[in-house]
From Swiss-Prot:
A molecular function (GO) term: metal ion binding
Membrane topology classification: Single-pass membrane protein
Transmembrane regions: 1961-1981
Gene3D superfamilies found in the cross-reference section: C2 domain
Entry binding sites for Ca(2+) 2: D1502, D1557, D1559, D1565
Tissue specificity statement from the Swiss-Prot or TrEMBL entry: Expressed in differentiating myoblasts and myotubes.
Family: Belongs to the ferlin family.
Cofactor(s) the protein requires to work: Ca(2+)
Protein name (record): Fer-1-like protein 5
Keyword Transmembrane among record annotations: yes
Length: 2038
């Protein structure tokens, strides 16, 4: 296969609208495309694969690469193309060809600045497990393969908002293979979120489903991504406990972030969940996609029942699939937060892809110890994004209350190895042992960024700290799983070292708090780290974790701020955590590398001009710093005793990546700089996340009225101190940083909470001895209490306090007597108590206001005579409180009045300003006021107002005023001044120093300063632990009773839960030396403010905010790209910071874009924030150049950008003497302009306009066009009769204008349509704003035609010896078959184009008749420029439109912009709109033919998951289509219809195609619709009116359909391009065109043999036309959309449109696209016999036997199941039947599928048509009388691709069913029964035994396929019934084995005994024979050995003589006679003569 990895691209010069780029790659006319990525430097790293099959690469092979921009509304914009020759790869197939920075060409084939980077390689079968159609069904146990399949590496997430959005999930189930089980009836359950969908029940182990399920969502993306998808295959015939066959699970987030949001045609391994013996139990082929608004579903062109999938992909080389087990070692938890519950029973729940396991419940404790192991079985690849942990409260037998949650990203605890280029294999998931932080409570707002690597980070978890869990994760790969849950034993002792804790100290200095909304109450900040510092947690020591209460002050424009000035509050929090410094050091080093790279990249991206010299300088700086950072070694983890497996694996991964990046930076060249740097940054971001950062984040809460309002989360590692050095410390450790606060989710969405500027330090307290965060200032620690007094009878004292204590805190909630304070350990009292007012609380409410409205109400009462007299209290405020009289109200110092008191008359009052009412006791104030006097009214009042203005002061006075404010805020002792320091007021109102006549309450603040003791080795502020006041248990009982009843007057609306609020000291950092600065902001322009480029900005202006100061630019008129060209100057800015600290971390400058709505209200559009450039002098100062900065909206989405720059200059002593401002900035009318050094350069540009006409405008009479650009305007002539001809009488216009030389700075072009009405009135009826002019810039001298490229003709190469051997000995499966050419039609062309049915079609002339199938709209094909090459369509809107404003019309036109010489004598460039269609030819009458092919994946509308679609066409007033012609019960209808319409273009130009769902009773629902602009197709120069065929045929099935011949088309094309007409020779085989001669032989290597081709002249002209990039004969795929779900894909429709203008002659012939009708076939299957069938029954003699019968059916036609008779008592597994099965099917030969139409239910209105593959199912069964029949085996044959049967039993085996053989010269023979219509032989049957398939029998069959006609000619009956012929089947001769026992018992007994004990008898006989031989040998061996040893040689010379010693016989006395041997007379020599004599 050929693999192309598309890495990245660079689009230069950048487009004003952020492009959504993708790359399309063509190889051998097969197109593949990448996903869409936003940005000018997109990075894909996406792999595209083409299968070469048996066609290897040749020297002339090439790739065509096209870079496109997917713009809005289904249009795509061409960017550039290039061709990559593959000659080098063909010659060196083992190498990888890297193509870096490939320069793209434009339409004129000229180089552009856009580049693409990719690499190409060839992959062979032995190198990968991927085979056939990119489907993976197994993998080996190779470690590298397993790790690379774990999770998707380097995910790229696009930013999503937190508001609910429309989403859609689709799951299409194709088929299953190799499902385990016997005689199963599988059904697939698809669970999407909580909705379950079921397929139809099928039969067999390889079922075919082809069903699709939809699920729509309207959810927040965070919740949508968390939902799971579960696909389960169950056996519907089995019991519920044994029904599950296998399942597959994933989460939607994983699918959404996959390429194309889709898993396309993937084989899923099915496994049983948590089963110890479970393996892969089958495979399921599915397509899963998750789509959002605007996402396009991938088009699957293949047939669902295509048979290209070979059996070998189901066979793995070593193991079926990679199975692994994730073991979770759950140790313990700590610091669990139970909320309102005092105790809970904690249980830890772990969730992985929907599977959940829980630990055992523990006793109620906040530190539970579980010590358990939870085991999950996973399949590699594990298609999940994260692991969830939840600690639940199960105290009430229900685990519903969640204590806290955490999550782990699989991509962060594992690696696929994709981060590093090379052989790095990654590592499997592992974690810990380490702590995970639990969170709960309020959630943060959802945001995802491109830098994120996990969508679950800080998304679904809360903000509040809920404790930590101590866990460990281990991945094991083994064949058998352990128990799901078990207890830990020895592992606990190995992790005890994790419990060692160290004391950490956290110090935070608050420097400023600005950009706040208005708070009526006092605010304070709380800092916490875990539970430490949380005031509401009583389990921890009180710490100095909160600041003093402060008010918020108005800044003079929009926001408020906290007036800290030189007194900065400080908090100090101590905590105890384990030592993770070794881990944080590595993380901080990586963050330094990433941050410096990102900073340099942002600067690089902001330089839009490629000719800017700063571009290369910044690139060199980036490379230099990256090399320095990457060569810095990371702390080694191999020698770290506390490091775990994940630490070591990540250290290895990070180290190798840094080494690789350093080398790449060293070799990098200045090409595609932004894209290369973005790729490096992306790879760094992938390895940076540290999941084992067990330290919780630092939380800063903004609190008001004891409620947490807004928060900021600071990662602990960013402020952590490291003794290893500053590089290992956090980037903000001891440094000033800017923090933006956020509201929790769902709160405060309309305001900005605050912008904080803080300095933080976190570290081990032993390193804090010499802690000094700021370079100047001193720290003050003091205790505080307030003395309270009330006024009773004109005397101040404690008598009138009632519920308020004598001494309390600032809120009056707690008693704090001075005698109860005690110094904390390590500190002592420095002085005695002194009175020091908190002047921050006493600031004037009118500070920073330029004008104040004062009001006094004059009150009168009606006396007894009815006259009005002054009331008892004549002057009050609006609430009735007494105030001074009008004449006594004095103007404060520094203010003045312009007008005196006047009566306000602009509300419901009478002519004198009085309003009347009836007084209601006891207050006497009326509840309702009326403007008309009645006799019963008892009182009246009127409102007197006046405005006072602040005096304007000079520079010196301003400084003195600033010093006054500072001196007022300074803390000082008042005892020496004779003042007592009392503050007058109430807790509900503001306190002030001056008493008022109505004052009844006063208080004063007492301070006592603390001083640290002698040095203790740590910073003294970390010793401030515990409460300063005496605990309540130490107080007297009376005092305790008194404190219980204390109430702070009337303002205690929120009381704390614990009344014992701890008393802690307050810490302040005093900075007495201020520094003054001047800030210069240069603002030029804002653009790209709307993605759809519709709305204009009404009176926009920019507000610049810097700390507590803000200024605004001038307000402009309405504009889509407002240009201010203005400088904003802030003078005398006061900062209490060291200038070096300010230069290193300056405050942020905030630019806010505002506009006005129709009511005049200000609306915030977006903000842009960045730090200014700081200059501490003007020695090296230069102007800061303008840069583009993104505008961020309220939810974090970047939309729009602003061109600006800022610089902050310190006012040194020399600069203070200069007149402000210190820089010379030009000023005009009081407005500072941009300095000339940074203004864009202007140049004269020519703008040509081709104004074609107006469309779809109603109620206009004489419209005309008005164009405005850069202060210049142009008007066209009005259209005289708009209703008859909406085109302009003159189409081309020209004018010049001065524009910026840089295209990115071009001013917008405004197109207005002005209607001339009666009496000369002109009204603007429509407007379009074109602010993106870059596509219209052109080179006027370039040529506008495409050169003809001659094709490279292939030359047949001579066969080599290996080729000869291959062809000689390779047995092709189709070698012996005749060439099969079936009848071709238009559908054949479609299948040739989509690649379907390749095996079934073998048409010799296929190459002559090809068409192009586009998977998108024709307008979306990049090469055709949206069919708007002649004129573009601009939507017209109202003059002041809103977001939902409708389109009021369209303007069709085009623009060309190019430099124009200012010298009148210079040559003028040629006009661009010279050769265009004659405008007099329009309107035109046209004949339109609409060919509707089919629809794909329509949205279901009915309850059965289907719909009944029908088509309605609308064109002008014409409407075609009928609801009666609906297609019942289908989501993929095949229309095959042609509609013919007549229209008048352009009056009738919009063709609307609607699909409706037919409903019998209710109204029909619209499925979706699509609109085609016919005028664009008619006018386009790409010939879109009629696609160009590949061949010119005068007759035949593919007859030329255009109304013009190719030669005339070529003549018109040359005329359109301004070229001379082509000239043909007399014979027509040569052509002179555009200065070149072309011959027909250049395109045809040999004379064509196809008989229907036309003459040579036309063929040659057609060849030339096909090289010009014209629209070919095609089928386009259009997306359907519906108003019910805007932006969501509702399905696709494939179609094409032909347009024939009547002025060009009669139209061409129609194309017959009628759907193919299936042919009826009859399959006759004769079951002759079986053999070697398993025997499953026992006879009386324990003999195995079976009663065999055979069952068969066609797949999908299970209701027509047939079976043979029963062969009883088979003792050998042999059975004879002679039985005929007859099956009838409707078969589509071209699609290789059977078609069936039947009703699902009796009450169904229409039948449902289904297609399924032609498969024959044969099963062997054992017949039982009482119990269910036993299943013995199954055979499944695909009739279109089946193995050739064996001719004898011995050759029949399971190897026949394999598609590929192990040996290349012995392939398995495969046939199609539709071609070879009759076969006979043996086939194997198999049965599942355990988890493996084995041979269970063999069946001999004859399969015969007959057409319907042949079946009528040769009729036959089923079984053995009549007509029993062809052939005649006789009943088999079967002997009843049961009766044979009685007929020949001895014979049968011997047979039974021999059969049963055959082996035993043979063994016994052999044993007896061997035993007899051995016994005989043992018996004879001793004698033989003895004789052999002795060797006797016996020789006898004479016999032995016997002598009668008695002499005579005494017969009378026999008893006395004795016979003796005379041995004494003979010698031994007589016996042995050889013996020597004695």
């Amino acid at each position: 296969m050929l693999r192309v990895v598309v890495e990245s691209a660079s689009i230069n010069p950048p487009l004003s609208t952020t492009p959504k780029a993708f790359v399309t790659v063509y190889f051998r006319d097969m197109m593949k495309r990448t996903r869409v990525e936003e940005g000018h430097d997109p990075i894909w790293n996406e792999t595209l694969i083409w299968h070469l099959w048996n066609q290897p690469l040749e020297n002339d092979s090439f790739l065509k690469v096209i870079l496109q921009d997917s713009v809005s509304k289904k249009k795509e914009r061409f960017i550039g193309l290039a061709t990559v020759p593959l000659k080098r790869l063909a010659q060196r197939p083992k190498e990888v060809m890297f193509v870096r920075d490939l320069i793209l060409l434009n339409h004129s084939m000229k180089p552009t600045n856009c580049t693409v980077t990719l690499h190409v390689a060839q992959i062979y079968d032995q190198d990968t497990e991927m085979t056939g159609n990119e489907e993976l069904l197994g993998s080996t146990v190779n470690e590298v393969t397993q790790k690379k399949l774990m999770v998707s590496g380097l995910p790229m997430h696009r930013a999503l908002a937190s508001k609910p959005q429309h989403f859609q999930v689709r799951v299409k189930v194709f088929e299953a293979r190799q499902l385990l089980g016997n005689n199963i009836k599988p059904v697939v359950k698809v669970n999407i979120a909580d909705q379950q969908h079921l397929t139809r029940i099928k039969m067999g182990n390889n079922p075919f489903f082809n069903e699709i399920f939809f699920q729509n969502f309207h959810e927040v993306p965070a919740k949508f991504f968390e939902e799971n998808i579960s696909i389960e295959v169950v056996d519907s015939a089995a019991s519920r406990s044994k029904a599950e066959i296998g399942r597959f699970q994933t989460d939607i987030g994983f699918i959404y972030h996959s390429p194309g949001h889709t898993l396309l045609r993937k084989w899923l391994g099915l496994c049983q969940r948590n089963k110890t013996t479970s393996g892969v139990r089958g495979y399921l082929k599915v397509t899963i996609c998750a789509l959002g608004v605007g996402d396009q579903a991938l088009v699957d062109q293949k047939l669902p029942y295509e048979q290209n999938t070979r059996v070998q992909i189901f066979k793995s080389k070593e193991v079926p699939v990679s199975l692994a087990y994730l073991q979770f070692f759950i140790y313990c938890a700590e610091d669990l937060h139970f909320g309102t519950h005092k105790s809970a029973t904690p249980v830890l729940e772990v969730e992985l892809i929907g599977d959940k396991l829980r630990t055992k419940p523990q006793n109620p404790s906040d530190n539970p110890i579980w010590n358990q192991i939870l085991t999950f079985q996973i399949q590699l690849p594990c298609l999940s994004s994260y692991i969830k942990f939840r600690v639940m409260d199960c105290s009430k037998y229900k685990c519903q209350d969640e204590i806290g949650s955490a999550s782990l990203c699989l991509s962060q605890i594992s690696s696929t190895g994709e981060e590093i280029q090379g052989m790095y294999s990654g590592f499997l998931p592992c974690f810990g042992p380490s702590f995970l932080t639990l969170r709960g409570g309020k959630k943060p707002p959802f945001r995802t960024s491109e830098e994120g690597t996990c969508i679950m980070d800080a998304v679904q978890h809360g903000l509040a700290y809920r404790g930590r869990i101590f866990v460990e994760i281990v991945t094991k790969i083994k064949s058998q799983q352990d128990s799901v849950m078990k207890d830990l034993s020895q592992e606990v002792t190995q992790v005890e070292m994790q419990y060692y804790r160290q004391k950490y100290g956290l110090c935070v200095i608050f420097l400023s708090c600005t950009m706040m909304p208005k708070f009526k109450d006092l605010i304070q900040f709380e800092v916490s780290m875990g539970h430490y510092g949380n005031k509401t947690d009583p389990n921890y020591k009180p710490l100095v974790s909160t600041t003093q209460y402060s008010p918020v002050i108005y800044d003079g424009t929009t926001y408020h701020y906290v007036p800290w000035y030189n007194t900065k509050p400080v908090v100090a929090v101590t905590s105890n955590w384990e030592d993770v410094g070794f881990r944080m050091n590595c993380l901080n080093l990586l963050h330094i590398t990433r941050d410096r790279l990102k900073t340099n990249l942002d600067i690089l991206k902001s330089i839009r001009n490629p000719r800017d010299p700063a571009l290369l300088q910044q690139w060199e700086k980036l490379l230099k710093e990256l090399q320095e950072d990457c060569r810095r070694p990371l702390p080694c983890m191999t020698d770290q005793p506390r490091a775990n497996s994940l630490d070591r694996n990540k250290w290895q991964l990070r180290s190798q990546l840094l080494q690789q990046l350093a080398q790449m930076a060293k070799e990098a060249k200045p090409v595609n700089m932004v894209g290369t740097a973005k790729e490096w940054l992306h790879r760094l971001n992938a390895v940076i996340p540290e999941p084992q950062e067990s330290l919780p984040d630092v939380l800063i809460w903004l609190m008001s009225r004891q409620q947490r309002v807004a928060y900021a989360r600071v990662p602990a590692h960013t402020v952590l101190f490291s003794p290893a050095g500053p590089l290992s410390s956090g980037k903000f450790c001891g440094k000033i940083q800017n923090i933006l606060l956020q509201y929790p989710e769902g709160e405060g969405q309309d305001t900005f909470p605050a912008s904080l500027r803080v300095c933080m330090w976190l570290g081990n307290v032993k390193y804090s001895k010499n802690l000094k965060l700021l370079q100047q200032g001193s720290m003050v620690v003091y205790a505080e209490t307030y003395e309270n007094q009330a006024k009773t009878r004109d005397d101040w004292g404690q008598q009138g306090l009632y519920h308020c204590p004598n001494f309390s805190d600032v809120m009056g909630r707690k008693a704090l007597p001075k005698t109860d304070f005690k110094a904390p350990p390590g500190w002592h009292w420095k002085d005695d108590w002194v009175v020091e007012p908190q002047r921050r609380l006493l600031l004037d409410i009118d500070i920073n206001k330029s004008q104040v409205l004062e009001e006094v109400y004059e009150n009168q009462l009606r006396n007894a005579t009815g006259a009005w007299v002054p009331a008892a209290i004549p002057n009050t405020d609006v609430n009735g409180q007494p105030v001074e009289a009008l004449e006594n109200v004095k103007c404060p110092q520094g203010w003045h009045f312009k007008k005196n008191w006047i009566v306000k008359l602009n509300h419901a009052v009478d002519s004198e300003g009085w309003e009347y009412g009836v007084g209601i006791p006891p207050s006497g104030l009326p509840q309702i006021w009326n403007s008309v006097e009645k006799t019963y009214h008892s009182c009246r009042r009127r409102r007197w107002v006046r405005v006072r203005f602040r005096n304007h002061k000079e520079l010196g006075q301003e400084r003195s005023q600033e010093q006054e404010t500072l001196s007022f805020l300074q803390m000082q002792d008042l005892s020496e001044e004779g003042k007592e320091g009392w503050e007058y007021g109430t807790f509900d109102s503001r306190f002030h120093l001056d008493p008022q006549p109505t004052s009844r309450f006063r208080r004063r603040c007492w301070h006592r300063q603390l001083a640290p003791n002698k040095d203790r080795g740590v910073a003294s502020i970390f010793l401030l632990e515990g409460s300063l006041a005496v605990e309540q248990k130490d107080q007297p009982r009376k005092e305790m009773e008194k404190t219980r009843s204390w109430q702070p007057w009337k303002d205690l609306r929120h009381t704390p839960e614990d009344p014992r609020i701890p008393t802690t000291p307050f810490i302040y950092y005093i900075l007495n030396k201020p520094h003054y600065y001047q800030l210069f902001c240069y603002i030029y322009q804002a653009r790209n403010l709307m993605y759809n480029q519709i709305l204009t900005f009404q009176e926009p202006f920019i507000q610049v905010v810097f700390l507590n100061h803000s200024l605004c630019t001038q307000t402009l008129r309405s504009s889509a790209a407002p240009t201010w060209s203005q400088s904003i100057i802030f003078q005398h800015l006061l900062l209490f910071e060291d200038p070096k600290d300010t230069r290193e971390n300056p405050p942020l400058v905030v630019l806010e874009l505002w506009q006005h709505d129709s009511r005049g209200n200000k609306i915030l559009w977006g903000r842009s924030m960045w730090p200014p450039v700081v200059w501490l002098g003007l020695q090296d100062w230069v102007f800061t150049p303008l840069r583009w900065h993104p505008l961020v909206r309220e939810l974090g989405e970047e939309e729009g950008e602003i061109l600006a720059s800022c610089e902050l200059i310190l006012e040194t002593q020399k600069l203070k003497e200069l007149h402000p401002p210190i820089l010379s900035i030009p000023c005009k009318d009081g407005i500072y302009l941009l300095p000339k050094n940074i203004q864009p350069t202007m140049k004269m540009m020519a703008i040509e306009i081709m104004a074609w006409g107006l469309r779809n405008m109603t109620k206009v009479r004489y419209p005309q066009l008005l164009l405005e650009c850069g202060g210049e305007s142009l008007k066209t002539e009005p259209i005289s009769n708009f209703q008859e001809n909406p085109n302009f009488p003159t189409s081309t216009f020209f004018f010049t204008v001065f524009m910026p030389l840089e295209e990115t700075h071009a001013q917008p072009l405004v197109v207005k349509v002005v209607d001339n009405q009666e009496y000369g009135q002109q009204i603007v009826v429509g407007q379009a704003n074109i602010d993106f002019l870059q596509p219209y810039f052109c080179d006027p001298w370039s040529l506008n035609y495409t050169t003809v490229k001659l094709p490279t003709l292939s030359v047949k190469k001579p066969d080599t010896f290996l080729d000869f051997v291959y062809k000689k000995f390779w047995f092709d499966s189709s070698k012996d078959e005749e060439v099969y050419e079936e009848e071709v039609d238009w559908w054949s062309k479609l299948f040739w184009a989509t690649g379907d049915a390749d095996k079934s079609l073998n048409y010799n002339h296929k190459s002559y008749h090809t068409l192009k199938v586009y998977d998108c709209e024709l307008e979306a094909v990049l090469t055709f420029k949206g069919l708007q090459d002649f004129c573009q369509t601009f939507k017209l809107y109202q003059e002041k439109p809103k977001v939902d404003s409708p389109v009021v019309g369209e303007f069709k036109g085009l623009f060309r912009i190019y430099p124009f010489p200012e010298d009148p004598e210079a040559p003028k460039p040629p006009r661009q709109f010279s050769a265009w269609p004659e405008i007099e030819d329009f309107p035109q009458m046209c004949l339109v033919r609409v060919y509707l092919i089919r629809a794909i994946n329509l949205q279901p509308q009915d309850y059965n998951g289907l719909c009944d679609p029908y088509v309605i066409l609308k064109l002008g007033q014409t409407k075609l289509g009928s609801r009666d012609s609906y297609y019942p019960n289908t989501l993929d209808p095949i229309f095959g219809m042609m509609y013919e319409l007549t229209c008048n273009i352009p009056l009738e130009k919009d063709l609307e195609i609607q699909l409706f769902d037919f409903d019998l009773i209710t109204a029909d629902d619209e499925i979706g619709s699509t609109v085609i602009d016919l005028e664009n197709r008619l006018l386009s120069g790409f010939g879109a009116r009629c696609g160009l065929s590949k061949s010119y045929c005068k007759s035949g099935p593919f007859k030329w359909r255009d109304q013009m011949t190719p030669s005339y088309l070529l003549y018109r094309y040359a005329k359109q391009k301004g070229l001379p007409p082509p000239v043909f020779d007399l014979e027509g085989d040569s052509l002179y065109y555009n200065g070149e001669t072309f011959k027909l032989q250049s395109f045809e290597s040999a004379p064509p043999t196809y008989k229907h081709l036309g003459p040579k002249k036309e063929r040659l002209a057609l060849y030339i036309l096909n090289t010009q990039g014209l629209v070919p004969e095609h089928v386009e795929t259009r997306t359907l959309h519906s108003n019910s779900q805007p932006g969501i894909d509702q399905g696709k429709i494939q179609m094409w449109v032909d347009i024939f203008p009547k002025m060009l002659g009669p139209p061409g012939p129609q194309v017959n696209i009628s759907p193919r009708k299936p042919k009826r076939y009859q399959l006759r299957c004769i079951i002759w016999s079986t053999a070697e069938v398993d025997l499953v029954q026992e006879t009386f003699s324990k003999e195995k036997m079976s009663d065999i019968y055979v069952k068969g059916w066609l797949f999908g036609l299970e209701e027509d199941t047939q079976k043979t008779d029963v062969h009883y008592h088979s003792l050998t597994g042999e059975a004879t039947f002679n039985w005929r099965f007859i099956f009838t099917m409707d078969y589509l030969t071209t699609e290789r599928a059977c078609v069936q139409s039947q009703k699902d239910y009796i009450w169904s209105l229409d039948p449902t048509s289904t297609k399924f593959p032609a498969r024959l199912m044969i099963q062997i069964w054992d017949n039982d009388f009482f119990s269910p029949d036993d299943f013995l085996g199954v055979l499944e044959l695909d009739l279109s691709d089946m193995p050739l049967p064996a001719q004898n039993i011995k050759q029949c085996s399971l190897k026949m069913m394999e598609t590929d053989s192990k040996w290349p010269f012995t392939p398995q023979k495969r046939i199609s029964l539709f071609k070879k219509t009759n076969v006979t032989g043996w086939w194997p049957c198999q049965v599942l035994d355990g988890d493996k398939w084995r041979l269970s029998g063999k069946v001999k069959m004859t399969l015969e396929m007959l057409s319907e006609r042949e079946a009528l000619i040769r009729p036959a009956g089923r079984g053995q019934s009549e007509p029993n012929q062809f052939p005649m089947l006789h009943p088999p001769e079967r002997n009843d084995s049961f009766l044979l026992w009685y007929q020949s018992p001895i014979k049968n007994f011997c047979y039974a005994v021999c059969k049963r004990y055959r082996s035993k008898i043979i063994c016994l006989v052999v044993t007896l024979v061997i035993g007899f031989i051995l016994l005989n040998f043992v018996y004879s061996a001793p004698s033989y050995f003895a004789m052999n040893w002795i060797k006797p040689q016996l020789r006898l010379s004479s016999p032995i003589k016997i002598v009668n010693l008695i002499g005579t016989v005494n017969t009378s006395n026999i008893n006395s006679s004795i016979l003796t041997m005379e041995g004494s007379t003979y010698h031994a020599s007589h016996v042995f003569p050889e013996a020597p004599a004695p």
